[in-house]
Structure formats: structure tokens, C-alpha cells
């Protein structure tokens, strides 16, 4: 027989306490699954004793992550995770730096690709330890014990600054780099049990249940690569990001994103806006981001990515395609920088503008002439007259990206005469040809800083056609002295055509702007 006094009846106070506790738990769960920066969620995995957190710093678009956890090892894991759900192939790239010396040399951070948020989930992690140890580690299936060394690939070097992970089908590839250096292949592993949709993102684990460690993550990019034979004309363009970068530290800021295509920013002389081409027109956008504003170019509505601003900041040169003209009809025009009616400079086509003379009276461009099937470098007065050929290359060779130095002594360009595409310079009369880069990359589009000291180039992989600068490739932006020297990497990006076809230096020579492809 039941006893009516054998249990306590809930009081109003008890109900209020229960509601408060449930509300607190819901708030914690909600906070952990709130989007942070470009990520959909952040959460502790495996219920670590010390809770983790992530703060997104909007000013520099970096992430400060804190996390505890005994380890990411054996049959289960404890750590803090910042992640997105993604299907298909991807490329993950970021800089990582631990805060302070830390309490355990085995604290770890990096990129993780994970099946679920379950503590026993299968995963593969590109890991940087507090000691500098850099390793690719994995759990092949849910609940399996991670083994040393069977489930690891160790890097020969240590203490890398940049970590990259790429998925190509079932294969997971890890690369890493020191600041200013190209990415190195660390290793790869086929993860047969990972589904098409996975979680991807950076993580932090203290390797000590009673401790919380901290890491800063910046230049975070998630790119969606396409097949090498992808044709944007047939299959559509990938999304784009407009980025700016401080060349002294390589920190990048995304100021504008779009699902369609835009290209080739110029930094405006007032240091307040960028100019870029999109959908056949030119647009201005504040350097800190905002809504693009269309520039008046009158009839010119088929403008490509070859446009540049005169040294005195008064005139704008564009390449606009005229319908029905040979070779696609690209022609060089000049108009006021504030907008207006373009004036035709090159009657013959095709002609692609790349630079101005420092006296603001001439332009330099590449063109096909006299029935030849190769491009050569030409200069011409903006007042008209006979154009002057500066190169005379052979069939199969290629030159492009011609640009004056601010002192007017040289014209820099990229040229393929044998082997890979490299950077060269000539004098304004075409004499004194001099090679400046000598590596295995295909180097394009030299852009000289306004102070005349530095050159930024885009470097394509060795395996592409040297005469081609295609879209959607794994590229680098690199910087070197104008007289030559070892290039230093500024950025690892997915891009190519339209990334930095024309000069995008800021007037103070401290920043550049460029376009990367997001895959959106």
C-alpha cells in the first residue's frame, strides 16, 4: 500500500531552482553551438574536466581558443573543437601559435577532420604539439585504440607555423610550412570509414585534465577545390573573397565575399577604396569592406581584369573588348579615375593593358600583332601615335604582366623562354633583358611597390602549362627585392586567374589586395 508521505512534494522554490538549472544548461549548450566567425559551432568533445571556449576577434579575423582535456588518444578524446559540417573535397589552411610556454609539452592544436562529436569518433588530425612535434594522427574507426606508431606519420622537422589539410576523395593530406616558406608535404592517409559529410575545424587540447591551454589561429581559410580540368565557362564560377594583407606580417583580412566572380583589385590613391572588375564593369569598395559602388565607364561594359591607375592618380587605364574585333577584341582605353568616357589607345586587337609609365604619358601592354600567334610587349603614348614593340619572342614562348618601376628605369614582366615561367626585366627601349627568379614555380605578374623596393608575384605550381595562368589552382603570393633574391611566401591560397593580375599595392607600400576563390 503506497504511503502518501513517502516522497516530497515539489515546492515553488524547488520548481524555480529546477527551471534555473535547466535554463543554465540550455544556455551553455546554445553558447557552444553558436556560430563563431566562419564556423557553425564550437564545443567541448568528451566532457573534459575544464571547459573550453572560442573567441572570434573581428578586428584581425583571428580565433582565440582555450581548451582542456586529458588527450586525443587511445579509444576516446577530450578537447575543444571549432567546426563546420562539410561534404566533398576541401583545403583547410591556417596559422597556429600557442600562448606562452604552457604546462605540458604534449598540448596540441591543429586541424581535425572528424566523423561526429562523439568522444570515440573516428578522426584524422594534423597536429602541432607544444614541444614542436608535428604529426598526422588518426583513429580509423569509432572506438578503436589509436596506436603509436601505426596510426601516425611524423614530420621530419618541427615547430611549423602554418598547417594545411586537404581531402581528395578518401585521402587526407597534411602539409606544413614555416613563415615565409613553401608548404612541405608531411604525409597522407586514406580514411576509408569517414563519410562524405564530416566535421572540419581547428582544435585545442591541454593534455592535462586540470589545465586549460590557449592557441591563436589566424589566416583561416576553407577552400573547396575543383577538378584540374574544371571549366568555369561551362560549369560556372566559384565564389570569391576580396582580401587585404599587411606584407610585414602576412596577416590577411577578408573585406568582401560573393558567390559569383570578381577580379584584380587596384588600391586607390586616396588609400580609402579598392577598384576591381566584376560582370564587365568596374566597382569601388572601401578598404575595410562595404557595398561595392559602380564606376561610370560609359559604353565600356566588357572590361576584363587588366586595368591600372596612373602614377599621378589622375587617370585610369582599362582593357575593354570590342565586339567583332580580332582575337576577342580586347583594346586599351584611358579615362579619368573618377569615371567618364574612355578614349581608345590601341586600334589593333587583341591588346591587354598592364602598366603606366611614371610620366603618366605612356602605357605598356601585351598584344598580338602582324599575324603572329604570340603576345609581345608594347608601349604607346596615350595621345596616340605608333606603338613601339619591346620584345620579339618565338612561337611557343610567352610574355605578360609588363609593369614599369616607379623610377622608370625598368619594365618588369613574366616570360617563358624555356622551362618554367619566370620574372624578367628590360629597359624601356627593350634592351638589357635580365632574369630575376630561377626556381621551379611558374611565376607571374610582378608588381613593384610604390617605394620601388619590393616586388610581389603570384607563383603557380610547376605542373601547370607555363604559358597558362588558370583559375582555381593552389598558388602562392610571394615577395622579393626588385633586384632579385630569394622570394618569401606571403600567402598560400586557392586562386590564380584574377587573383592579382594588376598592381594592388597600397600607396604607402605596406599592404596589398588580392582575390582568392572560396568555392562557395
Feature-to-residue mapping (PLM):
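Bacterial Sec-dependent N-terminal signal peptides
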Residues: 1-33
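Extracellular glycan-recognition regions
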Residues: 32-231
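Short loop/turn segments that connect beta-strands within the blades of beta-propeller domains
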Residues: 168, 238, 270, 278-279, ...
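Blade/loop signatures of beta-propeller domains
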Residues: 228-248
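Structural motif
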Residues: 239-241, 281-283, 326-333, 373-378, ...
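Multi-bladed beta-propeller domains
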Residues: 244-261, 287-303, 335-350, 380-398, ...
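Conserved beta-propeller blade repeats
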Residues: 259-275, 301-316, 348-366, 394-414, ...
